[in-house]
Amino acid sequence: MSEERSGPVEFSANVKMYGRDEPLPRRHELRAGPLSAVLEGGDLRYVKLGDDTVVLRLYAAIRDRNWNTIEPRFLRYELDRGDEGFTLQFAAENVGDDVDFEWQGSIVGTPDGVIAATLDGVARRNFLRNRIGWCVLHPMELAGVTATTETPDGRVEGQFPNLISPHQPFFDMQSIQHETPGGGEVVIRFAGDLWEMEDQRNWTDASYKTYSTPLRIPYPVELKEGDRVWQQVTIEGKGGPPPSPKSGEPVRVTVDRSRSRPVPPIGLGVASHGAPLSDEDIALLRAVKPAHLLLPLDLTQPGWQERLAQATTEAGALDAALAIEAVAGTDGAGLHELAAALSRSNVEIAKVLVFSTGEMVTGESVLAGTREAFGAAGLSVPIGGGTRAYFTELNRATLPLDAMEAVSYTINPQVHAFDNTSLTETLAAQPETVRSARAIVGDRSLVVGPITLRPPFNPNATGTEPQPAPGELPATVDARQPTLFAAGWLAGSVNALGNAGADALTYFETTGWRGVIERRDHPLRVSKFHSWPGMVFPVYHVLADIAEFRDGEILQVDLGDGLRVQALALRDGDELRVLLANMTDATVEVSLEVPGARGSTMRQLDDHSFTRAASQPEDFRASSQPLGVAVGVD
């Protein structure tokens, strides 16, 4: 279903916040004796023993042959909860692409501190799957904690990894046991399959995940009609102090003026839709002051010369450098032609990252071929590589670092989960990728990007990706791109990666569904993407705010509750700017502490000012008002 929108539209508050009219899923607070948890649909979140989170999330995952998640539809849902226990019984079906799976689920919590989750399902037709079953997310704050697992071969003692582990830290798990910071103990037992753990920080999830069906077993696996799957996970907690009383205090955000780093160069991706920037786009984007435009260039495909010429023109119009991610053909085919084209360019080339066709990680031969081609053309530009995919691939590779001046990897927060809360959780894990990457690459330039809400492509697909159904968005597009949530996520990401020491960042694209401004030449819209031609997205204003401090510093910020409020603090001389972002759908009261600050003003981008900011960006950016002692962030 498509519709035509030619000018500003007054969307609902929910659409402005997170891209759809429907309210966020209802949450229920539950207790099982000393354990507490939050129920959301068929998932348990934030299972705590006292004040200590022992399970970040417990959920059932149905993944198709390309690792796409097939979401459940509940056929029956019954919750009975008391003061010290609860029982959830439900029936669900997961239907999508080739997958057709129906299952009965139960999650039961008892006063003795035990939560048991059971899955009993059946395939309703033949299909290929990579995974079906419960997943347990252990919080990343367990890094360095000793744990003991039961396996078929006996007890094994190990640790939750500190630096991000490229491979599984625990195998063949029947149970895992560890202490909590408060002095309690948690034991998690697994039945119905073989289980192992992976370090999900590789994909910026803020967790370690225990899952069923070890990856050493070839996949995808065919389920035949009538095949059954049964699993059970049991969480037991005991000991430790009771939880602290709930506080009605504001979320406290504290800026540390004594710890800072230079604001990293921040660029944008060249728009993948291919349409050139209009004069109006260029005028708006000059306020964002992108340090560079990143151009993915497949030298094996026809037309790359025209795309390079267009990107060069756009970079020049924006006073930006050009960064190139080049995929060369067999034996470096295309590299000499690329070098010749760049030697005629009149814009600065920030870096060239090179890969061989069909490869996700840079190899030694393509680097050597690039240096030979560029040397022959008399070009002297930084040459590097890394991975076109996630930090995982970088972490698992043996890189020819001696031949690299820059090392890169990408980030998107939706490899495993897609809800707002999970996306917000990833912000705490982004710095961990920088810390672990720095241990690999040393003092070489570490560049992160593209950083997008959805992946530009699926690097883990084992078959052809299905085309979107009519009225649906492509897998590369997120309906939250033009929303306030995306702006908050962006501010939190720049804070996380900038303070962690990334040397350069690339976010989103210039225009279009993956950009910071909507296209002006494309009035026919998919109704699930709420925009109008030329609309300025909230992420634009975050980047424009940062651009005004591009020669300054980024300051450390203590987030009192990062799931509710994200922040970014910038300083340039005597000027200080703090961006606060409410990551929820409710008003949050914030106590902002900035030692030595005075004479403050504020500008608020919320559901009330959204349309003005989107249609009259210059007028919106010129507005401000005095800032009080405490801020209610809408």
Regions found by a protein language model. Name each.
Residues M17, R31, L56-N66, E93-D97, ...:
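Beta-strand-rich recognition/accessory modules
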Residues S2-A91, A147, P290, L294, ...:
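Acidic-aromatic substrate-binding/catalytic surfaces of carbohydrate-active enzymes
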Residues G269-P302, E314-L318, S345:
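Catalytic domains of carbohydrate-active enzymes, especially glycoside hydrolases
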Residues G226, G449-P538, D558-L563:
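Aromatic/acidic polysaccharide-binding cleft in carbohydrate-active enzymes
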Residues V108, D112-D193, R598-R621:
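Polysaccharide-binding surfaces and accessory modules of carbohydrate-active proteins
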Residues G560-A597, M602-D607:
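Carbohydrate-binding surface patches
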Residues P617-D634:
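C-terminal beta-strand-rich structural cap/linker in extracellular carbohydrate-active enzymes
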Residues R63-G121, E196-S207:
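Extended, loop-rich substrate-binding clefts of extracytoplasmic carbohydrate-active enzymes
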